[in-house]
Amino acid sequence: MKYGYYQICEALQSAADNSSYVNSVTWGNIFDVDMRKMTLFPLCHILTGTAEVLERTVIYSIDVLVMDAMDYSKQDPNVIPYSFEGVAQKQDIYHRSLFSLQEMIASLRRGDLYTDGFRLVNDPLCDPFDEDFESTVCGWKATFQIETPNPTIIC
């Protein structure tokens, strides 16, 4: 198997597509994504970071964002009893998008991506976000450090 930049892109695309929550996957500058297209959501957006080229391996640092568009609930959170699930959409989005990142992390640790030679070398810290792009979105961002064999090693 080859382990270049294309393959890491295909592997992450596959992991996001296999998530139980993600509807579409985009790459590159987040501001190039048409956030008004509601059919994109829930969305996984991947930002290429650095590539540390070592003698036998390459370690890619890649930011992965999983998000959904918010439609604010009319439920008053001060009314008792209050249930987050199914009522507070922001909480639902946080729950589902974090779970999607956990699925991707599991695939890199012991699933198909690990079997294919992609190894997660960090314990990703997931950060929640709440942004107003062209639509109001929220979700989680994680930075993955993924190690692959260096395809150009010299014997």
Language-model features and meaning:
Residues 1-7, 90-97:
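A short, highly charged nucleic-acid-interacting micro-segment common to nuclease
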Residues 1-14, 53-59, 110-155:
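Short, charged interaction patches at domain edges and termini
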Residues 1-57, 107:
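Small/polar-rich, solvent-exposed N-terminal microdomains that initiate assembly or binding
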Residues 52-53, 71-73:
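Short acidic, S/G/P-rich loop/turn micro-motifs used as interaction or catalytic elements
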Residues 63-72, 147-149:
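Short glycine-rich beta-strand segments
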Residues 72-93:
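A solvent-exposed, charged loop/short amphipathic helix patch at secondary-structure junctions
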Residues 92-118:
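Short, hydrophobic/π-rich interface segment
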